[in-house]
């Protein structure tokens, strides 16, 4: 029988396939076991999945959870639960983007370490070297280095800069350079002492733009996101929406309505900032964890030099405070905190913003890493930490963990209920107040300006005074003193605005956060 030249004998093909498979196994005996999860990983996945379902049932205010667990350089658990967008009934999946807030610092510090190695912006240079040409009102000594900015020991302060960059979004480069130069103060007594805030990373972003004419967003894309294959990660909200990427919309508890609502503060390009300005997926965070846990190697390649990875994970200053769930006086490296859990070293960085919570951590000694992202922040931060420690305790074999975590869930839900009731009681108390404004509402309408904090626009909304400060919009409620109103510039944080009058009795200013805003229109 003459066989076709284009077809092989099926029996011969089977024999060839068997030989190839046997050779592959001999060359890599672990390959056989990599084809399917082992019994322990399966048990872990079953228990973890069940616990997350219990959490979301007991705390239904949580819209969605995305979680990845890395063990021995492999993702053994990668899932998303719930809704990215409740109003549109859009489900979350492992490619859904979440805003990770301050967890961005780890990425920014890595980019800074790469530039340091290349001699472009040296970490141990004085920051004044890169601020040359700016007239700094504060006398900043040369001992304040770029590294100090990134490990929170600079002794610098500038509340208006960090507020505008993270919240209001009135943060164009020229104006922020001016606010940096004019408003920054230096306190020598604070120099060298850890004081966590966004300022150092914000200043680094400005110096980067000034020195290399490079936006921090583009630096992250070129040096980190692209080389790591993080295709579902961006520092531009506009690009995510243009690509029709699913974004987990932000939610939070509203004491006014007694329900979970969309966060009134949104993230746009203008308030995505170098201390907290990334959106990423849980799949991409799995790659990020693997890179950090494997000394810069990913998928068999050395993507980031090992010496740079070591520099990021080395502690440079004592934090002198607990950072739940990791206790003990820890250290701060370059964009990473270093602490302990169950007497094991943990390297981590959390993030939080109205409507989003993130937890990223790993235990190098046990080769375990976990990331959790939640699009809610009233209780989301605590839930994320609880899920992370559940993972660690399960994989460490902690005794009685199921009973322990059932109790933690119940206690947490009970405390959350008490917090909600306390906030609603405060709303009921404030509802008894009456307006103390002495003029018709229209008389207060106008634009008020402060050179440090920007512009406040006062309008009439719902028979009350409305306020717009950059991206932020809110409606005031009565306060207890003449010509004052209560506002929540940041959700859940009540503050007072007081209007001022000129000698002719005309409204010419308002005061907010201890600063005077002059009426300009």
Locations of regions flagged by a protein language model:
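Bacterial Sec-dependent N-terminal signal peptides
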Residues: 1-37
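Helix-centric, low-specificity signal for extended rod-like, repetitive segments
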Residues: 9, 21, 98, 413-416
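A generic hydrophobic-helix recognition signal that picks specific residues
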Residues: 26, 98, 190-191, 206, ...
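Catalytic loop of the DD-peptidase/beta-lactamase superfamily, centered on the K-T-G motif
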Residues: 35-79, 209-222, 226, 263-521
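Active-site-proximal loop and beta-strand segments within enzyme catalytic domains
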Residues: 45, 57-59, 83-198, 205, ...
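Active-site-proximal flexible loops/turns
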Residues: 73, 112, 162, 236, ...
């Amino acid at each position: 029988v003459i066989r076709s030249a284009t077809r092989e004998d099926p029996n011969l093909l089977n024999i060839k396939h068997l030989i190839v498979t046997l050779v592959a196994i001999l060359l890599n005996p672990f390959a056989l076991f990599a084809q399917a999860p082992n019994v322990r990983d399966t048990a872990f996945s079953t228990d973890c999945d069940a616990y997350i379902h219990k959490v979301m049932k007991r705390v239904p205010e949580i819209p969605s959870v995305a979680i990845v667990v890395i063990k021995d350089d492999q993702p053994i658990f990668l899932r998303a639960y719930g809704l990215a967008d409740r109003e549109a009934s859009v489900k979350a999946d492992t490619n859904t983007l979440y805003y990770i807030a301050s967890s961005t610092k780890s990425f920014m510090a890595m980019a800074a370490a790469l530039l340091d190695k290349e001699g472009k912006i040296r970490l141990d240079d004085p920051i004044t070297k890169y601020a040359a040409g700016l007239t700094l009102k504060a006398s900043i000594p040369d001992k304040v280095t770029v590294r100090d900015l990134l490990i929170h020991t600079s002794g610098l302060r500038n509340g208006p800069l960090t507020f505008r960059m993270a919240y209001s979004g009135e943060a164009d480069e020229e104006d922020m350079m001016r606010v940096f130069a004019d408003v920054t103060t230096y306190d020598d007594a604070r120099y060298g002492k850890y004081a966590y805030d966004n300022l150092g990373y914000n200043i680094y972003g400005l110096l980067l733009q000034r020195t290399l004419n490079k936006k921090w967003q583009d630096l992250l894309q070129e040096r980190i996101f692209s080389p790591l294959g993080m295709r579902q990660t961006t520092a531009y909200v506009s690009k995510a929406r243009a690509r029709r990427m699913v974004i987990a919309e932000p939610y939070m508890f509203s004491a006014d309505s007694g329900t979970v609502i969309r966060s009134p503060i949104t993230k746009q390009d203008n308030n995505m900032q170098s201390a907290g300005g990334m959106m990423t997926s849980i799949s991409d965070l799995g790659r990020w964890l693997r890179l950090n846990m494997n000394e810069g190697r990913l998928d068999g390649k050395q993507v980031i030099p090992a010496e740079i990875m070591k520099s990021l994970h080395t502690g440079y200053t004592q934090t002198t405070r607990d950072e739940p769930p990791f206790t003990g006086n820890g250290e701060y490296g370059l964009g990473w905190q270093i602490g302990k859990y169950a007497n094991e070293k943990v390297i981590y960085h959390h993030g939080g913003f109205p409507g989003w919570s993130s937890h990223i951590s790993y235990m190098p000694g046990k080769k375990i890493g976990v990331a959790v992202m939640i699009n809610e922040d009233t209780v989301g931060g605590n839930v994320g930490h609880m899920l992370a420690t559940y993972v660690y305790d399960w994989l460490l074999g902690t005794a009685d963990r199921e009973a322990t975590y059932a109790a933690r869930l119940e206690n947490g839900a009970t405390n959350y209920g008490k917090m909600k009731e306390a906030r609603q009681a405060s709303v009921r108390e404030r509802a008894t107040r009456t307006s103390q404004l002495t003029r018709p509402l229209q008389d207060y309408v106008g634009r008020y300006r402060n050179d440090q904090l920007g512009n406040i626009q006062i309008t009439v909304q719902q028979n009350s005074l409305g306020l717009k400060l950059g991206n932020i919009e809110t409606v005031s409620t009565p306060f207890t003193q003449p010509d004052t109103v209560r506002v929540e510039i940041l959700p859940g944080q009540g503050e007072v605005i007081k209007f001022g009058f000129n000698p002719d009795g005309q409204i010419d200013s308002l005061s907010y956060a201890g600063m005077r805003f002059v009426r300009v229109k």
